[in-house]
Amino acid sequence: MEDKPLTQPRQGLQSASTDNVDLTTFGSCVTEPAMPTYCVRFIPSITDVDSLTWNCLTGSGYPFLQHEFLLALEQSGCTNIQTGWQPLHALVETNTEINPRLIACMPLFAKTNSMGEYVFDWSWADAYQRHGLAYYPKLVTAIPFTPCAGPRICIAAGVSPETIHQLLFAQIQKLAAKIHASSWHVLFPEPELALSLSNLNLLQRSGCQYQWFNADYACFDEFLATFSSRKRKNLRKERMNIAEQGIVFEQLEGNAIHADHWQHFYQFYQSTYLVRGRAPYLNEQFFTELGRSMPQHLLLVMARKADHYIAGALFFKGEDTLYGRYWGCTEEMQFLHFETCYYQGIDYCITHGISRIDSGAQGEHKIQRGFKPVNTRSSHWIAHPDFSGAIASFLQEETQHINDYLQSAAQGLPFRKDLKL
């Protein structure tokens, strides 16, 4: 769950040396046969591929890669050249003139800034600028504004993943040379893809997030029973504090989420940005489009005080994971965020037998509430050999710091010492 917007970067880095690059024509690149069997095509819009065809490859277990999600981002104007997220999705097809078959797909964007990625490379852009080089545009395989690990390259059954990964990497390098992109970044991939890309000599980067895991709890109290006495009392006080103020919660799913709910929720979401003098990444049209096109994946938790809503949190339902994504409120209240974003989600997972909550970026305070620190990954290809070497050295040192932090942070978990969770 996004707790708050992240600090804005310094101005002047967002469009470095892209004046002579027509970003709107990226997807017009001529299809080049890459192997005797397959060819790669880059498309400037998700509308250039049929939704059923795309979704057959991506599956339904990870909602953010669904055609409907990417389409909502485009149609609402959240991903385009103006926002720095120009779609350029990669399709791998059989190399036949008649009825080519889609056998792999990958989300891809040409980026002219580093906003909304949650893997921070502003210092890399700084270094390029200091040496008179352009860091932007860069190529990014990610889900915009969504720091949730999941599939990044989806491949048909019976096709060698290693072959597709090699093929895509080769074509990415050609594309980067053609459009003068500095690099390719694969953000929050699954471990198997990260390993495969490491074998192709992409640099590997680690990060940390906090996730909740369901040990087949029968109820919230059974989860609390795993806490030490003091931590258990603290959490119960937090929930009691909210209940004593007369705040009640509605867990709305699918078509039970109506237009007025979206209006209230967007007011909450927007407030988390406006209070810091920033415009939100997403607009109200994006959320209403999600409600129309993929309601089966949505859980909206709304907090009501007396006769009006005061806070809300939006979750996405995956195959075995509840993804906490956006939240906001119009009344600041102690513990309201924890109840709306964490405890309501835990209640829902226990009731519905969901294995895990992925709460997104940030939030060290989640640890003492039972969210475990977990390692996240990203993979990076840097075209410039000298910068690639320098960044590799930086990442080696950073990775050690991350590993040390993961071990240290785990010591702050609230669980009883006699339990192994």
Language-model region placement:
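N-acyltransferase acceptor-side catalytic subdomain
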Residues: M1-L421
